Amino acid sequence: MREAPPQASSAQPRRLWVLSELYYPEETSTGYLLTRIAEGLATDFDVRVLCSQPTYASRGLRALGTEVRNGVRIRRCPSTTLDRTVRVHRLLNVLTIIASLWAFAIVSVRRGDYLLVVTNPPLLPFVAATVAWLRGASLLLLVHDVYPDVLTASGLLPRTGFLARRLRWLSQRLYRSARRTIVLGRDMKRLVETAMGVSGDSIAIIPNWADTEAIHPTKRAENALLVELGLIDKFVVQYAGNMGYTHGLECLAGAMEKLRSDEDVFFLFIGSGTKKPWLEAKVRELELPNARVLGNRPRGDQLNFLNACDITIITFVAGMAGVSVPSRMYNILAAGKAIIAVADQDSELAVMVRDERLGWVVPPGETNSIVQAVQAARRQPEVLLDMGRRARAVAERYSLSSVIEAYRRLLAGLESSGMMKG
């Protein structure tokens, strides 16, 4: 029997605020995930969202300033919505939405409320922590990326430099101020415990989920995208998702070059990110006949494009274990696809692929090992098929309902243990 959710009184459910740059109608990962979590909890809590106008995939769409959607009260705070692909524009967007969210939150949040915030953009959790402290709310920190580790692993900051050390000091205080820290995997829990000095008792592992109803394996020969691109007769290796500094696309470019003479193998990229222009330029520079780079596809088209391959590849640079857990992994599993995981051996991604026998694990940066994994997958169609079946079975264990239930238990535990203020 499900434990009753915490309530401020028998008549009125406790308020749960969600602070996020991205929310519906944004379909990018963070916006989609926060929307589903908020709506899933709206049957038990008075859920209220403070967010921005669309600046990512839905940029240009002017959403209502205030609305109630699926039981959630949404307030879209004013900010700039400039083209985020221009770095200075992205910075302006972040700074204006941070200021706007703080202004609305400081007059809206009350003592005893819950305040859920995600770690992206990295300034936002500090704003939420300030509001929680001033207003007497309980801060819930949802970790999608660990800072400054994500910046040092990608080479954007020297690991031992002054700025990285200062950010570490600030982050440690942020994490220690949270009533609960929610992480996406076992490796992330270990990192937060050691790097941030947070007790394991105050950390909850709540993974993301697979949309197993909308996404499932389909017949390859009938895949519309493969037909459109003329790839029905190719062995297709797909990379779908963000293409950022942490994703080690350089080793993929090397693998494509080494396999260029193999006319049966084709690399299909779908997504966007800061490294996408570099990848497109590299494909042109090397005149690779075995690669195609496409832009973002609507979330509603995932059934089609996630099935448009024989195997998927997820890559990270070295040092990303515990720093980030790829949300794309779960829907890839739902599509019944094996995975080549280019990742640290102790990362959540690598451990899952290895323990569940879902594909191949390759150390970051090892181009030759990627080539060998692709060739091994192509030579063993029956093994690949078995991996796909196991992938689908694993995906069934990661449902949205189980995630929402985990959040309910977390919130109930806070109140029953007397950790709530006020």
Where are these regions (language model features)?
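Carbohydrate-associated surface elements
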Residues: 53, 187, 206-209
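A short helix/loop element that forms part of the nucleotide-sugar donor recognition site in Leloir-type
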Residues: 62-66, 216-230
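Conserved donor-binding/catalytic core segment of Leloir-type glycosyltransferases
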Residues: 231-247, 253-256, 268
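A short, well-ordered alpha-helix in the C-terminal region of glycosyltransferases
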Residues: 234, 376, 383-397
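Nucleotide-sugar-dependent
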Residues: 247, 296-305, 312-333, 339-351
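Nucleotide-activated donor-binding/catalytic signature segment of Leloir-type glycosyltransferases, i.e.
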Residues: 264, 270-271, 276-303
